[in-house]
Amino acid sequence: AATVGGRGSFSANHLESLRLGKAAGGGGAAVPHTGTGPLVPALVGGRVTAAVGYSMLGGQSTDQVRVLGGAADERVETLPDAPTFKELGYDIVGGAFRGVAAPKGTDPQIISKLAEAFSETNKIIAEKQRQLGFVMTYATGEDAYTLVGRMKENYEGILQEIAAQKKKK
């Protein structure tokens, strides 16, 4: 049986690996790691048969690792030969989310200033992240709610399946 290394239990890449395994008609045992960094040595060392990480550029530096696909809408610029999971026939688009919130009832002008400040900061961060192989998406307002709703929809089913399996034990 396949063993799939990922970052932590119930992290975005752990849940995405479970979704991908289900979509591919298989499964495999999830092997949590303390971060993305330990995944490549685990894969190269044969401790796992596959790895799901936020950025696999480090793995590309060895001829023993090949990136099979990405969970983005479009191919990752820094990994142009790696197809998206959608290109491979799996409706899997996902990733990690970082959000900033303010208390309900916060003055709309303050919200606007915060959004502007984070937008400018994000431009700086996004370029560095792109160089590291990450795909950055910036969303505010309704777009952010839509993004969170999509993530909830993606993960809800797999989390319910995990809960049902735990009840059976």
Where do the protein language model's features map onto the residues?
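Conserved, function-defining micro-sites of small-solute handling proteins
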Residues: A1-K169
